[in-house]
Amino acid sequence: METIHFTKVHGSQNDFFLVDEEENHITEWSDEKRANFAIKLCDRKHSLGGADGILYVTKSSEVGPIGQMRVVNSDGSIASMCGNGLRTVARYLLEKHALTDAKVETMKAILDVKKATSLGFDIPTYQVEISPVKFAAETLPMHVGVEKLFNQVIPELDAELAFSAVSVPNPHLITFVDQAVLDSNKQEKLASYLNSENPYFPDGVNVSFVKRLSDDAIYVRTFERGVGFTNACGTAMSACSLIKKMLDNNILETPLNVYNDGGRVQVTAKKDAAGEISLQLIGNATFVSKGSVRYENDIVTELTNEATAEQAQYQALVKEVKEFLKTTE
């Protein structure tokens, strides 16, 4: 029998159980055990309400970063990156080490994180780096007959929609649409197909439909690989922001407001001397509750769960966002 302590967290209502492997003495768990635990704990029918995944936090394998984040989705699959999750991990580790900025190791890169100015309503807000950014088909991987997909119709996917693809480093397929397409079932049908066995994206892909709201604002809805529709996907919002800036010839460094069903974030971008692009995702890092479970014979049983006051703060932002989005329909 094992007792596992957790913090229930969310970034833009993309929710997770954050589990510190060192404090729980589970650093020797196998990947299979981590996956099985995630499947059980993240079940939406569980008494704790489930989650989109587990953020396993442990020591970095490199010198410099203050910790490492590993993301396991609710279906047990591994995500190479999660922007919303990284903001909450950034907060957890920065508070643990009494810092305001540092580096955190993820599966594909070591990324800068720091505390940021609040989005409003006294919401804890953090900024995290999203990189590397790659457009080559092999980095997704993608097989649609082109080496780089940018604002192009792919008849096999849809006869009318123009798609762009980018890895950040997890793969994203993005198209800009109007409200009528958002209201249709096109996204669900396409995303479900591309995340089952198919010849175009053999490893699956995150599929985002984006609506322009103004010169400095977009709305993003994402079907996440391994999860399905979520309130928000941090890497998707970052990737969509970059594509918008490229399509509209926007200044990379200018903040873009990104609205989603889970709230609002800001995204900026920059290009270094070598021409490499990196993104900065700025948004909430909300701690919903702290608790513990018993894990025995592949069964997860709730022991404790104490809520914080932070969700009420975030819901004030959500109310503001919903009222704004109504005016854009």
UniProtKB/Swiss-Prot annotation:
Give the catalytic activity: (2S,6S)-2,6-diaminopimelate = meso-2,6-diaminopimelate
EC supergroup of this enzyme: isomerase
Does the record carry Repeat as a key word?
Answer: no
Site note Could be important to modulate the pK values of the two catalytic cysteine residues applies to H172, E224
Q: Name one Pfam family in it.
A: DAP_epimerase
User: What are the entry keywords?
Assistant: Amino-acid biosynthesis, Cytoplasm, Isomerase, Lysine biosynthesis
* Signal sequence bounds: none
Family, per entry: Belongs to the diaminopimelate epimerase family.
Any idea what this protein is called? Diaminopimelate epimerase
What organism does the UniProt record list as the source?
A: Listeria monocytogenes serotype 4b (strain F2365)
Q: Which gene encodes it?
A: dapF
